[in-house]
Amino acid sequence: MTLRPTADTAAVGRPRVERKRLLVVGRDPGVTAVIAVGLRPRFETEAGITAAEALAQVRGEPLSLIIVDLAHSDLDAAFSIRALAARSPNCQIIVIGSTEHAGIADRLVGLHVHGFFTRPIDFGALVARVSLLSRLADDNSPDAGALALSRCSTHVLAYFSTHYAESFSLATLARAVGVSPGTLARVFLQDTKRSPRSFRCDVRVEVAKQLLAHEDHKLDRVAELAGFVDGSHLSRVFRLHTGRSPGQYRVEIRSPRPEARCASG
């Protein structure tokens, strides 16, 4: 899949291409960040929001897809999904849960739920499902080509979802995935049009966004949790990616607005 060179290029002066809107609902920062970053070529994404926030957002601009991660859900899972579907009847929904959530499928009959993925998440299968739904919904879209991840890149994304804050080399990542460093670099670049380091940086910025939105940690603590050296390092990278300082972003994202909060992805 073709990904943007930074997590938020529109904020630094480039023209924004009109894209479909995607909400990634859930409070697992690694999983939601990897999904948001990986699908940004196709969608304007916002990740790491709660079910209650998602319900408020659906009242605003139309949504194309909602991915609901049931881990640490703030509302009853079936209620949340049914409420989201009722407020956005044409929106497609994909659910992520553990084996204990498998029974929820029986309670969602009749809704536009187009996939149930159990943990550990197969990011390759998830991307393939999203790609198929996107192409079926809009065959004439210039961005409607298939998105695909190799098994190698699928394992890399899974590793990033749990180890994004750690410092590791390409060799360490390759050992974890089970391929040579050269193979990993070549295949991941072919699949995503970027290096593993670039993708991990975007994931860290996305995690920082979620922490700034939902936690009251000081900047150095946000930096530590997201994988940056310190608050100064986070500020430099965050401004490069979003055009705003972390403090500005926190104020803006928490400010009450008359309509649903604007998407931040």
Model-derived features with residue positions:
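Short hydrophobic/Thr-rich beta-strand motif most characteristic of the beta2 strand and flanking loop
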Residues: R42-T50, Q57
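Alpha4 helix (beta4-alpha4-beta5 surface) of REC/receiver domains from two-component response regulators
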Residues: F79, E100-G115
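C-terminal output helix
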Residues: I121-V130
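Conserved phosphotransfer microenvironments
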Residues: A51, S64-L84, H101
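Basic/polar phosphate-binding segments, predominantly the helix-turn-helix DNA-binding elements
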Residues: L170-D202, A223-S245
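The C-terminal output helix
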Residues: S131-A146
